UniProtKB/Swiss-Prot annotation:
The presence of a 'disulfide through disulfide knot' structurally defines this protein as a knottin. It holds the Pfam family Squash. It comes from Momordica charantia (Bitter gourd). It is found in: Secreted. Inhibits trypsin. Its main location: secreted. The lineage of its organism: Eukaryota, Viridiplantae, Streptophyta, Embryophyta, Tracheophyta. One of its GO terms (molecular function) is serine-type endopeptidase inhibitor activity. Keywords: Disulfide bond, Knottin, Protease inhibitor, Secreted, Serine protease inhibitor. This is Trypsin inhibitor 2.
């Protein structure tokens, strides 16, 4: 699944946080 590219959006999404590395304001 594609996670939000904006870090704050990723941080609000626990599923995304479990799957993504969020750095420098972006999710990758």
């Amino acid at each position: 699944r594609i996670c939000p590219r904006i870090w704050m959006e990723c941080k609000r999404d626990s599923d995304c946080m479990a799957q993504c590395i969020c750095v420098d304001g972006h999710c990758g």
